[in-house]
Amino acid sequence: MFRGVNQLNLDAKGRLAFPSRHRDRLLSHCSGEVVATIDYRDRCLVFYPLPEWEEIERKLIALPDLQPSAKRLKRLLIGHAQELQVDGNGRALVPPPLREYAGLEKRVVLIGQGNKFELWDESLWEQRRADWLQEAAAADAELPGELESLAL
């Protein structure tokens, strides 16, 4: 499981160096093979270990092409998906089209999300996080039923 927030720098070639605690897990879980694609709701990228992505991709491919929203989702997620290899130093090259989509230059934030990571431009992450905290404070009484019994 991947968790935690890490502030990182992309190097001059656009490579992301995964923190060592995640690097070891990626190398043992999927031999460092990951898939990066866009998040179609936010301007960030999503990184999945290859086995996780293959399961998602199977589900996406099974969606009906004649349904416009399903076809759009497939185009965005599968169309932007790139297989990446984490090298021995724990780095993976983030392809230029993906960096451009998410507005990634140097300062980035890597967010562990259980079975995947999100990669954000640092300033956009700080802005969105502040927005979400504000929204959460305003909507506290409106928790979905599934969350009402969760003690945090």
Curated annotation (Swiss-Prot):
Gene3D superfamilies: Transcriptional regulator MraZ domain. HAMAP family: MraZ. It comes from Halorhodospira halophila (strain DSM 244 / SL1) (Ectothiorhodospira halophila (strain DSM 244 / SL1)). GO terms for biological process: negative regulation of DNA-templated transcription initiation. Coiled coil: none annotated. Pfam families: MraZ. It is found in: Cytoplasm, Nucleoid. The keyword DNA-binding applies. The gene is mraZ. This is Transcriptional regulator MraZ. GO terms for molecular function: DNA-binding transcription factor activity; transcription cis-regulatory region binding.
